[in-house]
């Protein structure tokens, strides 16, 4: 109710509710119970994208297991936006470093995007939060590598740090 009341009306359905579902073994994510009332009030579908690094969310199969382990798919419908390709390429004509981004193609199935995020220190980006959720968060696995690599996905961990930040 808080989100809808603050906005002054309902979000246009269908609503994608972008969350960080949490990495396996990591406690630094907001738990489902905290977000549940807002998700229910929005009437939305929980959405996520696969990661570009090894772990419990780097493939669709592993990510589905993580979503189940953390309770997301038990209580809500979940859509992995990049579960199946091809990625959706979005142009960024005024981008300082990159001129396009690759996002999960299922994002076109939604008329509204509600971003639920936490604020944290991030080893590469300085701070993570809502803006990071809108760039890297909705990027496909390839898109995440593309952003981290400042347009060269193969340089995901070796690109110039400032170029990475400007890409995000």
Residue ranges and their predicted role:
Residues 1-168:
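N-terminal and secondary-structure boundary signal
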